[in-house]
Amino acid sequence: MEQTYQYAWIIPFLPLPVPMLIGLGLLLFPTATKSLRRMWAFQSVLLLSIVMIFSMNLSIQQINSSSVYQYVWSWIINNDFSLEFGYLIDPLTSIMSILITTVGIMVLIYSDNYMSHDHGYLRFFAYMSFFSTSMLGLVTSSNLIQIYIFWELVGMCSYLLIGFWFTRPVAAKACQKAFVTNRVGDFGLLLGILGFYWITGSFEFRDLFQILNNLISNNEVNFVFVTLCAILLFAGAIAKSAQFPLHVWLPDAMEGPTPISALIHAATMVAAGIFPVARLMPLFIVIPHIMNFISLIGIITVFFGATLALAQKDIKRGLAYSTMSQLGYMMLALGMGSYRSALFHLITHAYSKALLFLGSGSVIHSMETLVGYCPKKSQNMVLMGGLTKHVPITKNSFLLGTLSLCGIPPLACFWSKDEILNDSWLYSPIFAIIAWSTAGLTAFYMCRIYLLTFEGHLNVHFQNYSGKRTTPLYSISLWGKEGSKISNKNFRLVTLLKMKKNGRPSFFSNKVYKMDENVINLIQPFLSIPNFGNTKTYLYPYESDNTMLFPILILILFTLFVGFLGIPFNQDVDILSKWLTPSINLLHQNSNNSIDWYEFCKDAVFSVSIAFFGIFIAFFLYKPVYSSFQNLDLINSFVKMGPKRIFSDKIKNAIYDWSYNRGYVDAFYGTFLTAGVRKLAEFTHFFDRRIIDGIPNGVGFLSFFVAEVIKSVGGGRISSYLFFYFSYVSIFLLIYYFLNL
């Protein structure tokens, strides 16, 4: 056991050789390195698998045992200041290490096929391996300085991966936005770290908690300053976990490849956002106001993220806002002091969300054969629908992930979310009402995403790519508040082009196909991808390859069974409680971590009823019951029937506007913050050029002018000098005379 802990420092550095060797290989032997590129994927998976096995071994040893701090080396700046580096192995570290490695392995295996066509394949795996190193280093850190170092490396890797396709202007802007927004939180984190070092004189967690507790209990510290430093520390977590109001980078981050979206939402945002708050819980608990502030930010984010997800057209952005809301639940639980519930939901949500993102990637991958390699088309749920027959494995896996996130038993998120919802009643009835209402919204928007993606008919054959509706019937999620336009009954279907290798588009003749006893006239969507030698033609999407389906199937198992780790029927079965011993729980301080069947069933029936209500509303609005009507037009909502529908239309349009405009937060920042900073910069530039530079420039110009005048006067004649001399004397005498009158 001691030997295992002795070598635990190697955990973050095991994946590091891959990016280093890829970089050296591309620099010294580029052709050979590129030709053996699949080998690097295998090495990435192998090294991360070793880390996973090592982490699991540590986790087993951590059950009912104390945490281990190991000093490695120190960097001595001077006699009074030195930085110590080591690692901390405790239940929190074990949980995060297993989560990062398991999700990371699934994403790497998935990416091997998903990114196989991409010229940046090697670069992607180099970034991913370095990303894993950064996250593992973050969760094993023993002090605030190490956390900050690896925190910045996580931010750098996020920047590189979000902007992976940097030749696309949208992706380049997205990674810049993510970088700048996170810099706000990072600056707050740095100030908070320096503030607590000034108070306690230590960066080490164990010393920091003990010293601060003694200072506060003896009333030897400025409480306002301590609270300010704690808020600054929390600001870093707000930015990294996309909590309100520093969440604006999250939807734009979907411009990166789908596998990295899965890793960011399942592992990174909890490793770099929720983890620091959980790690610093002993510090925050002695500052009651900061706990209230954490729970307030959490409940705002819970509701805000759910409302923004209600009418998204992009499948990945809908899931992104879902992550924002679910991380809000975790932050709410931490703010309430329900440490176990927060970490339980962290685990269950991670695997469910990874399953959903990899499932969405499979859908996007299959849609690209029809609409081309353009995210605005392949990720647009307007063009999806009817995929059940074409991608059945992806459909079933996505359905399981959806039901898990909705809170349907016995799937993973049901067990963890229920604990948070029940604890919220003990903390604040107002917060509880918001949290329970948002649970219904979660079921609604997740079921909506599923229905628009997999049910009905494939809409790419019936809608143009601009998303304009072709009938006077509409849905708030698809067509928004656009005015009704009566379309021509003999409308022409979307024209699909084939891009030849010479880049010239060519039209293909119409052919008649039979779908569900309805004869429709389609243009066969032959597609060939330039430079990849693809000669296959596709009329419908097809299921992904086994390399992509294998991680999805493994994540299905996690989604089905990981929730049983924390079922609190009795203390012997509750593995999670044993794992987290000792655990912080301010709401159940005298609890023995077990509940009776009656209490559990009563709470479960209520939460499941709310989830089913949200699912029912989604089916009522988005189930395409009219899809067999003329032209197989997709109708997801009600038929307009005159003035009675005006009020409901306004509500739908308001919801759509709120979601489409991202809650107007981006517009607010653009109007007041960005525009204000630009005006301040313009004023500063004017003041600097005209005032600061103007004064010395003016003095110089005046001196030059006076010198030129004097120069022109001096002609070398004594009579001229005498004339000017007596003239000036006379002027001064007159001035003196008038002043003494």
UniProtKB/Swiss-Prot annotation:
InterPro entries (UniProt xref): NADH_UbQ_OxRdtase_chlpt_su5_C, NADHpl_OxRdtase_5_subgr, ND/Mrp_TM, NU5C-like, Proton_antipo_N
Any one GO MF annotation of this record: NADH dehydrogenase (ubiquinone) activity
A cellular component annotation (GO) from this entry: chloroplast thylakoid membrane
UniProt-listed GO biological process terms: ATP synthesis coupled electron transport; electron transport coupled proton transport
EC number: 7.1.1.-
Signal peptide: none
Catalysed reactions, as listed in the record: a plastoquinone + NADH + (n+1) H(+)(in) = a plastoquinol + NAD(+) + n H(+)(out); a plastoquinone + NADPH + (n+1) H(+)(in) = a plastoquinol + NADP(+) + n H(+)(out)
Record's bilayer topology term: Multi-pass membrane protein
Domain of life: Eukaryota
Keyword Flavoprotein applies: no
Localization of this protein: Plastid, Chloroplast thylakoid membrane
Record function comment: NDH shuttles electrons from NAD(P)H:plastoquinone, via FMN and iron-sulfur (Fe-S) centers, to quinones in the photosynthetic chain and possibly in a chloroplast respiratory chain. The immediate electron acceptor for the enzyme in this species is believed to be plastoquinone. Couples the redox reaction to proton translocation, and thus conserves the redox energy in a proton gradient.
Family annotation (PANTHER family): NADH-UBIQUINONE OXIDOREDUCTASE CHAIN 5
Similarity annotation: Belongs to the complex I subunit 5 family.
This protein's name: NAD(P)H-quinone oxidoreductase subunit 5, chloroplastic
Originating species: Guizotia abyssinica (Niger)
